[in-house]
Each structure stands twice: as structure tokens, then as C-alpha cells.
Regions:
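C-terminal and inter-domain tail/linker signature
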Residues: 1-119
């Protein structure tokens, strides 16, 4: 298994990359071509679908960034991490946990859950 801390860092780097060409390159370097992303409000299949989900979040929250909350952990082909989404230096009003399934060193499936949403 690849190091959970490294996978979590690279995963959140993708979500925070605003340059679309750089973001697509990061996605291609981390995700499997037939990967899938699911959370309660978004779904993306394949590299283009995942990029579209990320771009949608960035457009909806242009001044927010993802940051890891606590340590990532994992076993076998699975990684779990918690994250916050908010302005730099401020409290994260949106918090969640993502479960990542890997095939080799690439993300195959990500399932996200929201732990906290603004009222």
C-alpha cells in the first residue's frame, strides 16, 4: 500500500489546484482512468467527470481551500481522511470525511461524507 499521508496530501492538492491544466495533470497522475467519485451532492466518472466535480466546487466556493483535519490512516487498498473547506486562516464551515479505494497507487473510487454543513 502507498503511504496514506502521501495519498491524502496529493488528493487534497488536486482539490486546491485552481489552474485547470495543472489540475487535470494532477488528476491524471493520481486517479485511475475509470475512477469514480461520489458524495451526497456530486458524482463524477472518469478523469473528466472528476475534474468537473472539482471545478464545480471551486466555482461555488472561490475563496475556500481544503485542508486536512487530523491524520490520514489506511490499510490494504484503503485510505480515510477528514478535511475542512473554508477560507485560508479561518474556520472551515464545511467539514467531511472521504474514503479512498486504490488500485495499486491510483485512486479507483472515492466516497465522500459531510460531517458539518453551514446552517
Amino acid at each position: 500500500m502507498t503511504d496514506p499521508t502521501d495519498i491524502a496530501t496529493r488528493y487534497l492538492d488536486v482539490w486546491n489546484e485552481r489552474d485547470s491544466a495543472k489540475r487535470r495533470a494532477l488528476i491524471a497522475g493520481l486517479w485511475a482512468e475509470d475512477a469514480a467519485f461520489r458524495d451526497p451532492i456530486a458524482a463524477g466518472d472518469g478523469l473528466a467527470g472528476i475534474d468537473a466535480v472539482i471545478e464545480g466546487v471551486q466555482n461555488r466556493f472561490p475563496d475556500f481551500r481544503f485542508r486536512q483535519l487530523g491524520a490520514a490512516d489506511g490499510f490494504g487498498d484503503y485510505v480515510r481522511l477528514s478535511w475542512g473547506l473554508g477560507p485560508d486562516g479561518g474556520d472551515a464551515p464545511i467539514k467531511g470525511s472521504d474514503f479512498l479505494e486504490l488500485t495499486g497507487a491510483r485512486l479507483q473510487k472515492v466516497t465522500g461524507f459531510f460531517d458539518q454543513l453551514p446552517g
